[in-house]
């Protein structure tokens, strides 16, 4: 068991696969808008950690499957906690984009 797994941070690659298989699922990037614009996982929505109360503008169903990620897993752990407090029960912290092995979108990947 790795350090991040021990701390409750999920495996982002396995988490993305689970997200793709899930119905009524949302992938939420809790990093800042600037970080999100630089790079993000396709299909994700940006909802910064300091705006968790804005989740209702993205996810109306409190029983939906919500997968949260950040850079390394720390902010997404806090986001999971805050979303649980707001009544969203099916929230998974899938860890950090730094460990993601898939395709990313964002400014970093466009020719200038």
Please report, for each region that a protein language model flagged, where it lies by residue.
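N-terminal glycine-rich beta->alpha transition that marks the start or flank
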Residues: 29
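Rhodanese-like catalytic fold shared by cysteine-dependent sulfurtransferases
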Residues: 2-18, 22-25, 33-64, 71-112
């Amino acid at each position: 068991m790795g350090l991040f797994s021990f701390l409750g941070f999920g495996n982002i690659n396995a988490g993305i696969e689970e997200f793709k298989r899930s119905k009524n699922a949302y992938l939420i990037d809790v990093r800042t808008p600037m970080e999100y614009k630089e790079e993000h996982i396709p299909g994700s929505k940006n909802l910064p950690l300091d705006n968790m109360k804005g989740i209702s503008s993205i996810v109306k169903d409190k029983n939906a499957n919500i997968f949260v990620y950040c850079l390394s897993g720390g902010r997404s752990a806090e986001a999971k906690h805050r979303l649980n407090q707001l009544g969203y029960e099916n929230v998974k912290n899938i860890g950090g984009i730094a460990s993601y092995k898939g395709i990313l979108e964002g400014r970093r990947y466009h020719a200038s």
